[in-house]
Amino acid sequence: MKALVKTQHGTGHFAVQEKPEPTPGKHQVKIKVKYTGVCGSDIHTYEGHYPVAAPVTLGHEFSGEIVELGEGVTGFNVGDRVTSETTYSICGKCSYCTSGDYNLCSHRKGLGNQQDGSFAKYVIARQESLHHLPAGVDDRSAAMTEPLACTHHAIAKTSINKGDLVVVTGPGPIGLLAAQVAKSHGGTVIITGLSNDQVRLKKAKEVGIDYAIDTQEVDIKELVSELTDGYGADVVLECSGAVPAAKQGIDLLRKKGQYAQVGLFAQPEIQFNFEKIIQKEISVVGSRSQKPADWEPALSLLNEKKVNAKTLVTHEYTISEWDKAYHAIKSGEAIKVLLTPID
Protein backbone atom coordinates (compact mmCIF):
# COMPACT_ATOMS: atom_id res chain seq x y z
CA MET A 1 0.00 0.00 0.00
CA LYS A 2 1.01 3.64 -0.41
CA ALA A 3 1.75 5.72 2.70
CA LEU A 4 2.93 9.27 3.36
CA VAL A 5 6.05 8.89 5.50
CA LYS A 6 8.26 11.26 7.46
CA THR A 7 11.49 9.63 6.32
CA GLN A 8 13.95 11.40 8.63
CA HIS A 9 14.21 14.26 11.09
CA GLY A 10 14.55 17.85 9.94
CA THR A 11 12.63 20.14 7.64
CA GLY A 12 10.67 18.39 4.90
CA HIS A 13 11.48 14.74 4.27
CA PHE A 14 7.89 13.69 3.48
CA ALA A 15 7.59 10.99 0.81
CA VAL A 16 4.94 8.62 -0.50
CA GLN A 17 6.37 5.14 -0.09
CA GLU A 18 5.23 1.59 -0.77
CA LYS A 19 4.69 -0.29 2.49
CA PRO A 20 3.30 -3.75 3.27
CA GLU A 21 -0.36 -3.89 4.26
CA PRO A 22 -0.45 -4.18 8.05
CA THR A 23 -1.94 -7.19 9.83
CA PRO A 24 -3.85 -6.75 13.10
CA GLY A 25 -2.43 -8.43 16.18
CA LYS A 26 -4.28 -9.62 19.24
CA HIS A 27 -7.03 -7.19 20.28
CA GLN A 28 -6.35 -5.03 17.23
CA VAL A 29 -8.28 -4.23 14.07
CA LYS A 30 -7.31 -3.24 10.56
CA ILE A 31 -9.13 -0.13 9.35
CA LYS A 32 -9.56 1.07 5.78
CA VAL A 33 -9.09 4.82 5.99
CA LYS A 34 -11.86 7.00 4.52
CA TYR A 35 -10.59 10.46 5.46
CA THR A 36 -7.64 11.64 7.51
CA GLY A 37 -7.09 15.17 8.73
CA VAL A 38 -3.96 17.27 8.61
CA CYS A 39 -3.19 18.40 12.15
CA GLY A 40 -1.10 21.36 13.21
CA SER A 41 1.37 18.86 14.66
CA ASP A 42 1.78 17.36 11.17
CA ILE A 43 2.74 20.83 9.93
CA HIS A 44 5.20 21.21 12.82
CA THR A 45 6.60 17.77 11.99
CA TYR A 46 7.06 18.69 8.33
CA GLU A 47 8.85 21.87 9.37
CA GLY A 48 11.14 19.99 11.73
CA HIS A 49 9.77 21.46 14.97
CA TYR A 50 8.01 18.34 16.31
CA PRO A 51 9.93 15.11 16.97
CA VAL A 52 8.55 11.78 15.74
CA ALA A 53 10.03 8.30 15.46
CA ALA A 54 11.10 8.69 11.82
CA PRO A 55 10.70 6.88 9.57
CA VAL A 56 7.00 6.74 10.39
CA THR A 57 3.69 7.09 8.56
CA LEU A 58 2.04 10.25 9.86
CA GLY A 59 -1.66 10.89 10.48
CA HIS A 60 -3.77 10.44 13.59
CA GLU A 61 -7.14 12.08 12.82
CA PHE A 62 -9.24 9.70 10.76
CA SER A 63 -12.45 7.86 10.04
CA GLY A 64 -12.73 4.49 8.40
CA GLU A 65 -14.23 1.02 8.17
CA ILE A 66 -13.03 -2.15 9.86
CA VAL A 67 -11.86 -4.68 7.28
CA GLU A 68 -10.14 -7.26 9.50
CA LEU A 69 -10.31 -8.32 13.14
CA GLY A 70 -7.38 -9.53 15.18
CA GLU A 71 -7.59 -12.37 17.68
CA GLY A 72 -9.84 -11.71 20.67
CA VAL A 73 -11.61 -8.62 19.37
CA THR A 74 -15.16 -8.29 20.71
CA GLY A 75 -17.82 -5.63 20.28
CA PHE A 76 -16.70 -4.73 16.76
CA ASN A 77 -17.29 -6.35 13.39
CA VAL A 78 -15.97 -6.14 9.86
CA GLY A 79 -17.85 -3.31 8.14
CA ASP A 80 -18.27 -1.17 11.25
CA ARG A 81 -17.70 2.55 10.77
CA VAL A 82 -15.21 3.71 13.38
CA THR A 83 -12.70 6.25 14.50
CA SER A 84 -9.87 5.64 16.91
CA GLU A 85 -8.10 7.38 19.72
CA THR A 86 -4.48 8.12 18.94
CA THR A 87 -3.11 5.87 21.68
CA TYR A 88 -1.52 2.74 20.21
CA SER A 89 0.13 1.41 23.36
CA ILE A 90 0.70 2.38 27.00
CA CYS A 91 2.51 0.87 29.96
CA GLY A 92 -0.81 0.22 31.71
CA LYS A 93 0.83 0.39 35.14
CA CYS A 94 1.65 4.00 35.96
CA SER A 95 -0.66 6.26 37.96
CA TYR A 96 -1.65 8.08 34.77
CA CYS A 97 -2.71 4.88 33.03
CA THR A 98 -4.70 3.69 36.03
CA SER A 99 -6.56 7.02 36.13
CA GLY A 100 -7.31 6.94 32.39
CA ASP A 101 -4.89 9.76 31.58
CA TYR A 102 -3.21 7.83 28.78
CA ASN A 103 -2.04 11.07 27.18
CA LEU A 104 0.37 11.50 30.10
CA CYS A 105 1.88 8.00 30.19
CA SER A 106 5.65 8.34 29.73
CA HIS A 107 5.73 5.09 27.75
CA ARG A 108 2.77 5.87 25.51
CA LYS A 109 3.12 5.34 21.78
CA GLY A 110 0.78 7.27 19.52
CA LEU A 111 -0.46 6.73 16.00
CA GLY A 112 1.32 8.93 13.51
CA ASN A 113 4.15 9.71 15.92
CA GLN A 114 5.80 6.58 17.30
CA GLN A 115 3.58 4.15 15.39
CA ASP A 116 2.47 4.17 11.75
CA GLY A 117 -0.64 6.30 11.38
CA SER A 118 -3.47 7.08 9.00
CA PHE A 119 -1.78 8.78 6.03
CA ALA A 120 -2.18 5.44 4.28
CA LYS A 121 -4.81 3.10 2.87
CA TYR A 122 -4.93 1.05 6.07
CA VAL A 123 -4.11 1.67 9.72
CA ILE A 124 -3.96 -0.64 12.73
CA ALA A 125 -5.72 0.40 15.94
CA ARG A 126 -6.23 -1.36 19.24
CA GLN A 127 -9.74 -2.38 20.27
CA GLU A 128 -9.66 -0.29 23.45
CA SER A 129 -9.12 2.87 21.39
CA LEU A 130 -12.00 2.30 18.96
CA HIS A 131 -15.29 4.18 18.86
CA HIS A 132 -18.33 3.35 16.76
CA LEU A 133 -19.56 6.24 14.65
CA PRO A 134 -23.16 7.30 15.31
CA ALA A 135 -25.41 7.16 12.25
CA GLY A 136 -25.75 10.94 12.33
CA VAL A 137 -22.01 11.55 12.00
CA ASP A 138 -20.67 11.51 8.44
CA ASP A 139 -17.18 10.27 7.57
CA ARG A 140 -15.70 13.74 7.02
CA SER A 141 -16.93 15.01 10.37
CA ALA A 142 -15.80 11.80 12.04
CA ALA A 143 -12.26 12.38 10.79
CA MET A 144 -12.26 15.45 13.04
CA THR A 145 -13.28 13.64 16.22
CA GLU A 146 -9.70 13.73 17.51
CA PRO A 147 -9.20 17.51 17.33
CA LEU A 148 -12.69 17.95 18.77
CA ALA A 149 -11.75 15.61 21.63
CA CYS A 150 -8.66 17.78 22.19
CA THR A 151 -10.81 20.88 22.57
CA HIS A 152 -13.21 19.03 24.87
CA HIS A 153 -10.19 18.01 26.95
CA ALA A 154 -8.96 21.59 27.21
CA ILE A 155 -12.33 23.06 28.09
CA ALA A 156 -12.91 20.36 30.71
CA LYS A 157 -9.89 21.84 32.51
CA THR A 158 -11.73 25.15 32.86
CA SER A 159 -15.12 26.11 34.22
CA ILE A 160 -17.39 27.87 31.73
CA ASN A 161 -20.75 28.99 33.06
CA LYS A 162 -23.71 30.45 31.20
CA GLY A 163 -22.93 34.04 30.26
CA ASP A 164 -19.18 33.83 30.86
CA LEU A 165 -17.04 35.66 28.33
CA VAL A 166 -14.65 33.26 26.62
CA VAL A 167 -11.88 34.46 24.31
CA VAL A 168 -10.45 31.94 21.85
CA THR A 169 -7.19 33.09 20.27
CA GLY A 170 -6.46 31.56 16.88
CA PRO A 171 -9.21 30.79 14.32
CA GLY A 172 -7.67 27.61 12.97
CA PRO A 173 -9.51 24.27 13.15
CA ILE A 174 -8.76 23.81 16.86
CA GLY A 175 -9.86 27.35 17.67
CA LEU A 176 -13.05 27.05 15.62
CA LEU A 177 -13.91 23.76 17.32
CA ALA A 178 -13.04 25.11 20.78
CA ALA A 179 -15.24 28.15 20.20
CA GLN A 180 -18.19 25.92 19.33
CA VAL A 181 -17.64 23.74 22.40
CA ALA A 182 -17.46 26.86 24.58
CA LYS A 183 -20.75 28.02 23.04
CA SER A 184 -22.31 24.67 23.90
CA HIS A 185 -21.45 25.41 27.56
CA GLY A 186 -23.40 28.67 27.42
CA GLY A 187 -20.46 31.03 27.05
CA THR A 188 -20.41 34.26 25.06
CA VAL A 189 -17.49 33.66 22.73
CA ILE A 190 -14.99 35.93 21.01
CA ILE A 191 -12.58 34.34 18.55
CA THR A 192 -9.59 36.40 17.44
CA GLY A 193 -7.32 36.32 14.42
CA LEU A 194 -5.23 38.52 12.16
CA SER A 195 -5.95 40.26 8.88
CA ASN A 196 -4.89 37.20 6.87
CA ASP A 197 -7.45 35.08 8.74
CA GLN A 198 -10.53 36.56 7.03
CA VAL A 199 -11.73 33.22 5.63
CA ARG A 200 -11.54 31.66 9.08
CA LEU A 201 -13.13 34.60 10.87
CA LYS A 202 -16.00 34.56 8.39
CA LYS A 203 -16.46 30.84 9.07
CA ALA A 204 -16.59 31.57 12.80
CA LYS A 205 -19.58 33.82 12.24
CA GLU A 206 -21.22 31.18 10.05
CA VAL A 207 -21.06 28.60 12.86
CA GLY A 208 -22.60 31.01 15.36
CA ILE A 209 -19.64 32.46 17.24
CA ASP A 210 -20.70 35.75 18.84
CA TYR A 211 -17.71 37.87 17.85
CA ALA A 212 -15.06 37.14 15.20
CA ILE A 213 -12.40 39.81 15.60
CA ASP A 214 -9.43 40.87 13.50
CA THR A 215 -7.13 42.20 16.22
CA GLN A 216 -5.20 44.24 13.66
CA GLU A 217 -8.36 46.24 12.99
CA VAL A 218 -10.23 46.16 16.30
CA ASP A 219 -8.99 47.00 19.81
CA ILE A 220 -9.77 43.65 21.42
CA LYS A 221 -8.95 44.84 24.93
CA GLU A 222 -11.44 47.68 24.60
CA LEU A 223 -14.13 45.30 23.30
CA VAL A 224 -13.58 42.85 26.16
CA SER A 225 -13.71 45.70 28.65
CA GLU A 226 -17.00 46.97 27.18
CA LEU A 227 -18.57 43.52 27.31
CA THR A 228 -17.53 42.88 30.93
CA ASP A 229 -17.92 46.29 32.60
CA GLY A 230 -14.16 46.54 32.75
CA TYR A 231 -13.55 43.20 34.48
CA GLY A 232 -12.04 41.21 31.61
CA ALA A 233 -12.67 37.78 30.12
CA ASP A 234 -13.53 34.83 32.33
CA VAL A 235 -11.67 32.28 30.22
CA VAL A 236 -9.01 32.42 27.52
CA LEU A 237 -8.38 29.39 25.32
CA GLU A 238 -5.09 29.98 23.48
CA CYS A 239 -5.26 27.86 20.34
CA SER A 240 -2.78 29.54 18.00
CA GLY A 241 0.58 28.64 19.49
CA ALA A 242 1.64 32.22 18.75
CA VAL A 243 3.56 34.06 21.46
CA PRO A 244 1.84 37.45 20.90
CA ALA A 245 -1.57 35.78 21.23
CA ALA A 246 -0.53 34.06 24.46
CA LYS A 247 0.67 37.33 25.96
CA GLN A 248 -2.50 39.08 24.83
CA GLY A 249 -4.60 36.33 26.37
CA ILE A 250 -3.14 36.92 29.82
CA ASP A 251 -3.74 40.65 29.40
CA LEU A 252 -7.41 40.14 28.49
CA LEU A 253 -8.30 38.05 31.53
CA ARG A 254 -10.10 39.32 34.58
CA LYS A 255 -8.70 38.81 38.05
CA LYS A 256 -9.12 35.13 38.97
CA GLY A 257 -9.56 34.35 35.28
CA GLN A 258 -8.69 31.03 33.66
CA TYR A 259 -6.10 30.53 30.92
CA ALA A 260 -5.69 27.26 29.00
CA GLN A 261 -2.80 26.73 26.58
CA VAL A 262 -3.97 24.47 23.77
CA GLY A 263 -1.83 25.47 20.78
CA LEU A 264 1.73 24.23 20.35
CA PHE A 265 4.53 26.78 20.15
CA ALA A 266 7.18 26.48 17.44
CA GLN A 267 9.82 27.00 20.13
CA PRO A 268 9.34 25.37 23.55
CA GLU A 269 10.62 28.30 25.63
CA ILE A 270 8.85 31.66 25.50
CA GLN A 271 8.81 34.81 27.62
CA PHE A 272 5.69 35.15 29.73
CA ASN A 273 4.59 37.90 32.11
CA PHE A 274 4.22 35.97 35.35
CA GLU A 275 3.79 39.21 37.29
CA LYS A 276 0.32 39.59 35.72
CA ILE A 277 -0.48 35.97 36.51
CA ILE A 278 0.48 36.51 40.14
CA GLN A 279 -1.17 39.88 40.66
CA LYS A 280 -4.41 38.86 38.93
CA GLU A 281 -4.43 35.36 40.50
CA ILE A 282 -4.88 33.81 37.08
CA SER A 283 -5.16 30.04 36.83
CA VAL A 284 -2.95 28.73 34.02
CA VAL A 285 -3.29 25.19 32.73
CA GLY A 286 -1.73 23.28 29.88
CA SER A 287 -3.77 20.86 27.79
CA ARG A 288 -2.05 17.96 26.08
CA SER A 289 -3.97 16.13 23.39
CA GLN A 290 -6.97 14.15 24.69
CA LYS A 291 -7.80 11.08 26.76
CA PRO A 292 -10.40 8.31 26.48
CA ALA A 293 -13.03 10.21 28.49
CA ASP A 294 -13.11 12.96 25.84
CA TRP A 295 -14.12 10.84 22.86
CA GLU A 296 -17.75 9.89 23.45
CA PRO A 297 -18.63 13.47 24.47
CA ALA A 298 -16.95 14.68 21.27
CA LEU A 299 -18.97 12.25 19.16
CA SER A 300 -22.14 13.31 20.98
CA LEU A 301 -21.41 16.97 20.16
CA LEU A 302 -21.17 15.98 16.49
CA ASN A 303 -24.21 13.72 16.55
CA GLU A 304 -26.36 16.30 18.34
CA LYS A 305 -25.23 19.00 15.88
CA LYS A 306 -23.87 21.18 18.68
CA VAL A 307 -20.60 21.32 16.75
CA ASN A 308 -20.42 21.63 12.97
CA ALA A 309 -17.09 20.11 11.97
CA LYS A 310 -17.85 19.32 8.34
CA THR A 311 -18.24 22.98 7.40
CA LEU A 312 -14.64 23.60 8.44
CA VAL A 313 -13.37 21.29 5.67
CA THR A 314 -12.34 23.54 2.81
CA HIS A 315 -9.83 21.40 0.92
CA GLU A 316 -9.41 17.70 0.14
CA TYR A 317 -6.33 16.11 -1.42
CA THR A 318 -4.84 12.66 -1.80
CA ILE A 319 -1.83 11.73 0.30
CA SER A 320 0.30 12.19 -2.83
CA GLU A 321 -0.64 15.89 -2.89
CA TRP A 322 1.00 16.88 0.38
CA ASP A 323 2.68 19.95 -1.10
CA LYS A 324 -0.70 21.34 -2.16
CA ALA A 325 -2.19 20.62 1.25
CA TYR A 326 0.74 22.25 3.04
CA HIS A 327 0.64 25.41 0.95
CA ALA A 328 -3.15 25.72 1.28
CA ILE A 329 -2.77 25.65 5.06
CA LYS A 330 0.25 27.95 5.29
CA SER A 331 -1.28 30.54 2.95
CA GLY A 332 -4.36 30.84 5.15
CA GLU A 333 -6.56 29.79 2.25
CA ALA A 334 -7.57 26.51 3.92
CA ILE A 335 -9.30 25.99 7.22
CA LYS A 336 -9.31 22.22 7.54
CA VAL A 337 -7.65 19.91 5.03
CA LEU A 338 -8.57 16.25 4.70
CA LEU A 339 -6.47 13.69 2.86
CA THR A 340 -7.64 10.49 1.17
CA PRO A 341 -5.64 7.31 0.48
CA ILE A 342 -4.35 6.22 -2.93
CA ASP A 343 -4.02 2.72 -4.37
From Swiss-Prot:
InterPro entries named among the record's database cross-references: ADH-like_C, ADH-like_N, ADH_Zn_CS, GroES-like_sf, NAD(P)-bd_dom_sf, PKS_ER, Zn_alcohol_dh
Gene3D superfamilies given in the database record: Medium-chain alcohol dehydrogenases, catalytic domain, NAD(P)-binding Rossmann-like Domain
Binding sites annotated in the UniProt record for Zn(2+): C39, H60, E61
Residues binding substrate: E146
Chain positions recorded as NAD(+) binding sites: I174, R200, V262, G263, L264
GO molecular function: D-xylulose reductase activity; L-iditol 2-dehydrogenase (NAD+) activity; zinc ion binding
Segments of this protein annotated with the region Disordered: 1-26
Enzyme class label: oxidoreductase
Reactions catalysed: keto-D-fructose + NADH + H(+) = D-sorbitol + NAD(+); xylitol + NAD(+) = D-xylulose + NADH + H(+); L-iditol + NAD(+) = keto-L-sorbose + NADH + H(+)
Complexes and interactors: Homotetramer.
Role noted for this protein: Polyol dehydrogenase that catalyzes the NAD(+)-dependent oxidation of various sugar alcohols. Is active with D-sorbitol (D-glucitol), xylitol and L-iditol as substrates, leading to the C2-oxidized products D-fructose, D-xylulose and L-sorbose, respectively.
Name of this chain's protein: Sorbitol dehydrogenase
Organism: Halalkalibacterium halodurans (strain ATCC BAA-125 / DSM 18197 / FERM 7344 / JCM 9153 / C-125)
Gene of this entry: gutB
